[in-house]
Amino acid sequence: MEDDGYYLDTDLDLSFTSTATDRTFTSSSARSSLARSSLTLSFNDRLSTATTPSTTTSSAATTLHHRRYDPHWTSIRAATTLSSDGRLHLRHFKLVRHLGTGNLGRVFLCHLRDCPNPTGFALKVIDRDVLTAKKISHVETEAEILSLLDHPFLPTLYARIDASHYTCLLIDYCPNGDLHSLLRKQPNNRLPISPVRFFAAEVLVALEYLHALGIVYRDLKPENILIREDGHIMLSDFDLCFKADVVPTFRSRRFRRTSSSPRKTRRGGGCFSTEVEYEREEIVAEFAAEPVTAFSKSCVGTHEYLAPELVAGNGHGSGVDWWAFGIFLYEMLYGTTPFKGGTKEQTLRNIVSNDDVAFTLEEEGMVEAKDLIEKLLVKDPRKRLGCARGAQDIKRHEFFEGIKWPLIRNYKPPEIRGLVKKTKAHAGHVTAAVTPRRNKWLWWALSHLLRSKSLSKSSSKIQSNNNYYHYVGKKL
């Protein structure tokens, strides 16, 4: 049991040193958000010795999220139970290595001290002393947004810890890094259609959830899409979000669907089957929660992903996320963004003035992808796909045909270079995925074992019968 009187927050050495290789999961790309801080947090300071433990506060989440058997929550509950005041403090954590630098601070891999089964967390450390008042408001925005989220494709805020001039946010750790780094490991920095459809579908569901809460993301890009250990995505960095009112609606939608059915006809004594097409009307009930009244004049985001209305400075709403979603699709397919110029200024001019987007690949599925991207990259947000009824309109597009959206979390992540996946064997424990070759060997071993037992039982039964008849014969 940890002695709370020994590891004082005032004695916590924030100068991080590790024998492990300093691996950063933040992309080395020059692309950055327009509201990005020029923060150069050295993390070589110690908390002032004048600080008392009473000034260190912690607000660990008290609600149990949907991941009921998540080992993270098990570790958190164990640590808070052993703590003298029932709260988490910085002294409870051990920093493992530096992961990268975000818009507002630095991120570290850490785990709880004295935990029998150490579980990795990402600790985002923000030095409030080096931030402007506007940047501090971004910190509070991100903390507020994180506290609202409960979704498999979004991070969980396990705790917020304020110590001296530091604010620390404890969230999920994603060992596979970000999607931008993963793209750079692929041939020509691009992905085939199938993985693109997988990642796009999960991002779409995450955006749908945010919009249902009235949250406009405004910073969608591969650098902000992290890959969990099981290969599924997690959006990150919510400091540029803004909230708006949203009124959920539940409507019945009528549409016509063309179907075909075989019909047998007799011609010249033969029996032939012909296809007869007919139209039928279907009524589908849809839930939609799009913040259509959202409005902001702040110019924030990443220049290559900015929507035309945002560049023009005339105000924008949730439609900027659907524009960015179209840019995101294009970059995954082509390895670059469609309006990229030689400079940031040229890129912004291209976004406002260029009407045509170049499409060169002709592989299977590109026709549907091209059509979806063109409908998302409509300069007038009133005509842009998704701006009226949100993600529901995008889900119905042919590019996503065949996806069972309620089961999206159960789809198997793609096999692509640089993606190391792990699967959950049972609740709370994670094990490496079994390779096909090992899987084949396991099945062979199992069948061999069962066959051996079957032969053993048969031999035993024959021997038993022989003994029985031998005994009966003697008795007779």
UniProtKB/Swiss-Prot annotation:
Gene3D superfamilies recorded: Phosphorylase Kinase, domain 1, Transferase(Phosphotransferase) domain 1
GO cellular component terms given for this protein: cytosol
GO molecular function ontology, one term from the record: protein serine kinase activity
Residue ranges constituting the Protein kinase domain according to the UniProt record: 93-400
Enzyme Commission identifier(s): 2.7.11.1
Changes seen on gene knockout: Enhanced root waving when grown on agar plates.
Location of the active site: 219 (proton acceptor)
Cellular location(s): Cytoplasm, Cytosol
Domain of life of the organism encoding this protein: Eukaryota
Protein's UniProt keywords contain Transferase: yes
Biological processes, Gene Ontology terms: auxin polar transport; auxin-activated signaling pathway; cotyledon development
Main location: cytoplasm
Ligand binding (ATP): 99-107, 124
UniProt key word Nucleotide-binding: yes
Catalytic activity: L-seryl-[protein] + ATP = O-phospho-L-seryl-[protein] + ADP + H(+); L-threonyl-[protein] + ATP = O-phospho-L-threonyl-[protein] + ADP + H(+)
SMART domains, per the entry: S_TKc
Keyword set, alphabetical order: ATP-binding, Auxin signaling pathway, Cytoplasm, Developmental protein, Growth regulation, Kinase, Nucleotide-binding, Serine/threonine-protein kinase, Transferase
SUPFAM superfamilies listed in its UniProt record: Protein kinase-like (PK-like)
UniProt similarity note: Belongs to the protein kinase superfamily. Ser/Thr protein kinase family.
Note: Over-expression of WAG1 induces a basal-to-apical shift in PIN1, PIN2 and PIN4 localization, resulting in the loss of auxin gradients and strong defects in embryo and seedling roots.
Role summary: Serine/threonine-protein kinase involved in the regulation of auxin signaling. Acts as a positive regulator of cellular auxin efflux and regulates organ development by enhancing PIN-mediated polar auxin transport. Phosphorylates conserved serine residues in the PIN auxin efflux carriers. Phosphorylation of PIN proteins is required and sufficient for apical-basal PIN polarity that enables directional intercellular auxin fluxes, which mediate differential growth, tissue patterning and organogenesis. Acts as a suppressor of root waving.
Name of the protein described by the UniProt record: Serine/threonine-protein kinase WAG1
Underlying gene: WAG1
